[in-house]
């Protein structure tokens, strides 16, 4: 297995949880239930695992990681204009909503850490930066971030949402055409 710190803003806004990726390397089916975790022979916490078939792994979280701090920031949403076109008396406008989030991770420990940052997955939104996540569950992206001892690192997550709008030109769309013709975001094509 692998020791990690697991950050989810909705679980604890400031600190990640200590975690461990447990892999069942036996030929036996491990039944669900409570387990006790030790770190270098010292009690680290208790956790509960779900059924674990042979060859599969589970992420277990068991205690707050007080030596690591995460500061999430949201730079707000913006809209970018993609295209404006005319077709059969209708103006078609394509925009893209953009959301930019950053996670500043401070490792105050004397050991390097791998932080798994959980970020909400929304089906309509497309991941723009980074291009893909380390893993994805039904409701979450998970991004892996390595942080050296006594250092900080930042993960930036940028997502886009396509928005389509159509305006019938007989509804006073001439003013709209003039507006989009003057904007610097649209190419003359």
State where each predicted segment sits.
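Intrinsically disordered, low-complexity Ser/Thr/Pro/Gly-rich interaction regions
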Residues: 1-104, 111-124, 128-129, 133-145, ...
């Amino acid at each position: 297995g692998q020791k990690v710190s697991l950050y989810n803003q909705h679980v604890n806004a400031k600190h990640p949880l200590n975690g461990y990726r447990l892999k069942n390397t036996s030929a036996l089916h491990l039944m669900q239930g409570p387990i006790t975790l030790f770190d270098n022979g010292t009690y680290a916490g208790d956790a509960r695992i779900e059924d674990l078939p042979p060859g599969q792994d589970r992420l277990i979280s068991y205690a707050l990681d007080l030596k690591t701090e995460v500061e999430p920031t949201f730079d707000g949403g913006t809209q970018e204009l993609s295209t404006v076109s005319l077709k059969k008396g209708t103006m078609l406008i394509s925009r893209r909503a953009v959301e930019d989030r950053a996670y500043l991770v401070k490792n105050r420990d004397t050991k390097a850490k791998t932080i798994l940052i959980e970020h909400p997955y929304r089906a309509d939104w497309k991941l723009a930066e980074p291009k893909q996540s380390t893993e994805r569950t039904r409701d979450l992206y998970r991004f892996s971030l390595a942080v050296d001892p006594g250092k900080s690192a930042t993960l930036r997550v940028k997502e886009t949402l396509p928005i389509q709008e159509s305006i019938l030109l007989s509804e006073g769309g001439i003013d709209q055409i003039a507006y989009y013709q003057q904007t610097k975001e649209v190419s003359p094509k």
